[in-house]
Amino acid sequence: MLGIHVKKTKEELIISWQFSKIHIPLCEITEVIEDNTYAGVEEKSAIRIGTAYGTTDRILIKTVKQNYLLFTTNRVSILNKIKA
């Protein structure tokens, strides 16, 4: 499992990377956007998922409790799964 894997169920978004698995309830997600900052420096408290080096795209998932910053080279596929 090299990259970030995203699965969406009826109730939650499941993000898997390496040995980590994060469950985010869909009702808590407020916004999903592409982050154009380098290394997500504007979201200092965000949980970073993926390798910051060697990736060209960043996806910011804002929730009621916590923000998540995904480092990926597979932006289109991940956004399609999240927004499906």
UniProtKB/Swiss-Prot annotation:
Domain of life, source organism: Bacteria
Family assignment from sequence similarity: Belongs to the UPF0457 family.
Name of the protein described by the UniProt record: UPF0457 protein BT9727_3043
Lineage per the UniProt record: Bacteria, Bacillati, Bacillota, Bacilli, Bacillales
